[in-house]
A protein has these predicted regions:
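N-terminal, polar/Ser/Thr-rich
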Residues: 3, 22, 29-67, 153-159, ...
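Bacterial N-terminal signal peptides
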Residues: 12-25
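Glycine/proline-rich low-complexity spacer/linker segments in large multi-domain proteins
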Residues: 42-45, 124, 133-186, 234-242, ...
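Ligand-binding face of N-terminal immunoglobulin V-set domains in extracellular IgSF glycoproteins
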Residues: 67-87
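Hydrophobic helix-coil surface modules that form long, contiguous segments used
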Residues: 68, 163-167, 174-335, 364-367, ...
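A surface-exposed beta-strand-loop module
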Residues: 89-151, 174, 210-212, 544-551
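Non-catalytic accessory/interaction domains
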Residues: 188-191, 214, 254, 339, ...
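Catalytic Zn2+-binding segment of zinc metalloproteases
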Residues: 338-353
C-alpha cells in the first residue's frame, strides 16, 4: 500500500511514492478496541477457521447502501458452542449453519468489531457452512465499500471501490479479517447492466436481469488474506495486452484511455522482471491497474491481488501536460504495488508485527526495478534522501524497531510509517549489498517457493538467506530489525603503506534526542573503499577498533556506494581529504558524505566547521542537482537557527557565496534537454537565494 506522499517534496522531489495510512479517516474513526492485556494480541479464537467465501453482493450506489449474502465454508478444529468472526457497521438479518436445525443467537461487540454466533450445543470438529444475509453502508471515504463521485460528460457520476487494509474487509462482509486467516473467495455482484464490475479475478459468466441489471460471477481467487479482496463498479473502459501469459489492463473512467498508456507500458516492463526475480510467475490470469477518480485521501494506492487500486494522479499520464517527473512518480508507484503481488499477496505476514515484510520490500524493490529500466533517472541517488529521512526519524526518542509488537488493529494502523517503509527498504539494501545480489535473490526465490499462498514471520526470510550463505545474516538482520536506532561508524585511524590503507573503525550510536543516547550495539556490515579502488567488506561491532585493509592510498569512504544503513563519522583529516577530491566521488557518495557530516554536526557529534568546509566546496563543484538541493535544504535549516540573531546577516552572506555560483551556472532559462531535477534545482535555488537576500534573484 502506498501512503499519501507526504515526503515527496522534502526528500524525493520527483518520484518518492511513499504512501500508507498516516491517520484514520476522521469520519470513519474506528470504535476503540478493548485494552489488550500486556503482551497479548486481540485476535479471533482459533477454534474455527475459514476455508472459502461465496459472497453475493447487491450495491445501491445512489442510496449508499448494500445488501449481501455470504456462505462461508469453515473448519471447526475443536468442540465449541460459538463462532466468532469480525463484523463492523453490518447488520446480520439471518444466520444458519449447515447441520444445525436451530438458528444461532447473534451478538455484536462494537469495541473489538466482532459478531458471535452462539449455538444451543457444542459443534463437533469438522467442516460446516455458515450462511448469512446482511446489509451495510457504502462510505464516502476510502474504507470498506466506498463511493467516489466525479463530473462526467453526462453530469455527476458515481463509482464504487473497496479499501480493506488493514482491517476493513469486516465492513464489507462478516469475515475472519486477519492476515493469517487466508481463504479462497468467490464474488458475485448484481449491478447496472451498463457499468463495468471488477474484482481480483476475471469474470466467469454474466446473466442478464430485468430492470437494466446484470449478475456478474467472478472466478474463484487463490488462497489469500481478506484485506486483499476487491470490488469495483463504474462507467469504465479498459485497455490491456498480454504480458507473459497474463492479461494486464489499465482501467479508467470512460474517456480517459489516452492517459493509460504509460502505466500499461510500465506494467508490461515490470511484470516479466518480477516473474524472473522472484522465481515464481505471477499466479493470477489477469492483473488490473485501476484508476479511481480524484486525488489521494490518506493513501495513494492499494495492492489488491490482481486488481490494484490507484488514485488517478498516481497512475495516469496525460501526454499533453505531464512532466518527466510525473512519469517517474507513476512508474515507481506502479512498481511498488506490483511488487506487493508477491511480497504481501502471494506470501503474507502472519500478523501486523511483520508489516515491513510487505512494505519495506516493496519500497526497496520499487527503486531496484525502476533503476533497472531507467538508470538515467538516478533513483538510487534520490532514494538516499528517503534514507536520510528514515535516519532522522529513527534517531528520535519516539522511534520503534522495524519488527514491533502489535496487539490490535488500531495499533496496526499506526505501523504504516517511515520506519516500516523507508528504514525497512534501507535495511534490505544493506543486507543485499553485504550478501551480494545473486545470493540475496536466491534467498528471496526460496522464500517465495517455500511459502507461496501462506503466512510468514520475518525469521522465515532470514532462514532462507542463511541457507545460502556462510555470513551471519540472521544475527545482523536481528540487530537492525529488532532494535531501534541508527548505528554510527567512526573513522578511528587510516594509514597507507605500500599501496594498502590500514583503516580502523568503531561502532557507536547516532542520536538526536538526549534520551536516545543509551549505548547500543549493532553488527554493522561496512563496505569501505579508498577513492577509485575496489571496496572491502567487514562486520563492525562495538567500541573496540575493527581493522579493515583497503586497496589504494586515496581518501577513505566508509560507506562506499552509500548502500548501508549507518552514519559515517570521519576524522577531520579524513573529511578534509574527501573534500579535496570531492568532485571525483560518485554523486551517491557526495550526497551520503554530505548528509552524514551535516547531521552529525547538527547534534554535536562532529565539528560544525567540518560541515561548513565541506559545504563551501559546492561553490565550484558541478554536482548533481539532487546533491545541490540537499545543500540548499541544509542551509535553509541553518538560516532558521540564526533567525533573529545578529549573526544571521553574516551567515546569509556566506550562504549566498556558496549557492550564488551554482545558480549562475544553472541560469534563469531552461536549457535544451534539461532534466527535471535541474528544473527543480533552479526553483530551489531561486527560493533559497531569495531567503538569503541575494539581489540576483530579488
Amino acid at each position: 500500500m502506498k501512503l499519501k506522499t507526504i515526503f515527496r517534496q522534502a526528500y524525493r522531489p520527483a518520484i518518492l511514492a511513499f504512501a500508507v495510512f498516516v491517520v484514520q479517516p476522521p469520519a470513519l474513526a474506528r470504535a476503540a478496541d478493548a485494552p489488550a492485556a500486556a503482551g497479548q494480541r486481540i485476535v479471533l479464537p482459533a477454534a474455527v477457521t475459514p476455508d472459502h467465501y461465496r459472497i453475493d453482493l447487491t450495491p445501491d450506489a445512489k442510496a449508499l447502501t448494500y445488501k449481501a449474502t455470504v456462505q462461508i465454508d469453515v473448519s471447526v478444529h475443536q468442540p465449541t458452542d460459538r463462532i466468532v468472526l469480525n463484523a463492523a457497521d453490518i447488520v446480520i438479518d439471518k444466520a444458519a449453519l449447515s447441520g444445525e436445525a436451530a438458528a444461532p443467537t447473534v451478538s455484536y461487540d462494537a469495541k473489538v468489531q466482532t459478531a458471535t454466533f452462539a449455538f444451543a450445543r457444542a459443534l463437533k470438529p469438522g467442516p460446516y457452512t455458515l450462511s448469512l444475509a446482511y446489509r451495510g453502508k457504502i462510505y464516502q471515504q476510502a474504507s470498506g465499500l466506498f463511493a467516489l463521485d466525479y463530473d462526467g460528460a453526462g453530469g455527476k457520476k458515481r463509482t464504487l471501490f473497496t479499501q480493506f487494509e488493514n482491517s476493513d474487509a469486516r465492513r464489507f462482509t462478516p469475515s475472519w479479517d486477519e492476515p493469517g486467516r487466508k481463504a479462497t473467495f468467490q464474488l458475485t455482484a448484481t449491478v447496472p447492466a451498463d457499468e463495468m464490475a471488477l474484482s481480483n479475478m476475471p469474470i466467469a459468466s454474466t446473466d442478464a436481469l430485468p430492470g437494466g441489471l446484470k449478475r456478474v460471477h467472478f472466478k474463484e481467487t487463490p488462497k489469500m488474506s481478506s484485506y486483499l479482496l476487491f470490488f469495483g463498479l463504474g462507467d469504465f473502459e479498459r485497455v490491456h495486452r498480454d504480458v507473459d501469459g497474463v492479461d494486464v489492463g489499465v482501467v479508467v473512467k470512460r474517456g480517459d484511455t489516452a492517459s493509460a498508456g504509460f502505466a500499461l507500458d510500465a506494467a508490461a516492463h515490470i511484470l516479466p522482471y518480477y516473474n524472473d526475480y522472484f522465481g515464481t510467475p505471477f499466479p493470477l490470469p489477469k492483473l488490473d491497474l485501476i484508476a479511481g477518480p480524484g486525488s489521494s485521501q490518506f493513501f495513494g494506492a492499494m495492492e489488491n491481488w490482481g486488481a490494484i487500486f490507484y488514485f488517478e494522479r498516481d497512475l495516469l499520464i496525460d501526454p499533453r501536460v505531464s512532466t518527466q517527473g510525473d512519469k517517474q512518480g507513476v512508474y515507481i508507484v506502479v512498481a511498488h504495488e506490483m511488487a506487493h503481488q508477491w511480497f504481501g499477496d502471494l506470501v503474507t505476514m502472519a500478523w501486523w508485527d511483520d508489516l515491513w515484510l510487505n512494505e519495506g520490500f516493496a519500497s526497496w524493490m520499487e527503486t531496484k526495478v525502476t533503476d533497472h529500466f531507467h538508470p538515467e533517472w538516478k533513483v538510487w541517488l534520490q532514494d538516499l534522501q528517503a534514507k536520510q529521512f528514515a535516519m532522522e526519524t529513527d534517531a528520535r526518542d519516539g522511534t520503534h524497531p522495524i519488527v514491533t509488537p502489535i496487539y490490535d488493529v488500531l495499533q496496526a494502523a499506526g505501523a504504516f510509517d517511515a520506519i516500516t517503509y523507508l528504514k525497512g527498504a534501507a535495511v534490505i539494501r544493506t543486507l543485499e549489498s553485504y550478501l551480494g545480489e545473486d545470493a540475496f535473490r536466491a534467498g528471496v526465490r526460496r522464500y517465495m517457493h517455500d511459502h507461496a499462498y501462506g503466512n510468514t514471520v520475518t525469521d522465515d526470510l532470514w532462514s532462507e538467506m542463511d541457507r545460502g550463505s556462510a555470513r551471519p545474516i540472521t544475527q545482523i538482520a536481528h540487530d537492525f530489525t529488532l532494535q531501534a536506532g541508527v548505528p554510527m561508524i567512526t573513522q578511528a585511524s587510516a594509514k597507507c603503506e605500500g599501496g594498502v590503507t590500514s583503516l580502523a573503525v568503531t561502532q557507536g550510536h547516532y542520536a538526536i534526542d538526549p534520551g536516545s543516547t543509551t549505548a547500543r550495539v549493532w553488527r554493522v556490515p561496512v563496505i569501505a573503499a579508498t577513492l577509485g579502488a575496489a571496496p572491502a567488506k567487514a562486520v563492525v561491532s562495538g567500541e573496540r577498533p575493527t581493522p579493515i585493509a583497503l586497496a589504494g592510498c586515496g581518501p577513505v569512504v566508509l560507506n562506499a556506494g552509500q548502500t548501508a544503513y549507518f552514519r559515517s563519522r570521519y576524522s577531520t583529516d579524513g573529511l578534509a581529504a574527501i573534500a579535496a577530491h570531492y568532485g571525483a566521488l560518485s554523486p551517491d557518495d557526495q550526497l551520503g558524505v554530505f548528509n552524514d557530516t551535516a547531521s552529525l554536526a547538527y547534534v554535536g557529534q562532529a565539528p560544525m566547521a567540518d560541515f561548513l568546509d565541506l559545504t563551501a566546496t559546492f561553490k565550484t563543484l558541478a554536482a548533481d542537482p539532487v546533491v545541490v538541493q540537499a545543500v540548499g535544504d541544509r542551509l535553509d535549516d541553518l538560516d532558521t537557527l540564526y533567525e533573529g540573531l545578529p549573526s544571521q546577516a553574516a551567515f546569509r552572506a556566506w550562504a549566498r557565496g556558496v549557492l550564488g555560483p551554482v545558480f549562475a551556472r544553472v541560469g534563469w532559462d531552461k536549457a535544451p534537454g534539461e532534466s527535471d531535477n535541474t528544473a527543480l534545482l533552479r526553483a530551489r535555488l531561486i527560493g533559497a537565494l531569495g531567503d538569503f537576500d541575494d539581489p540576483a534573484v530579488l
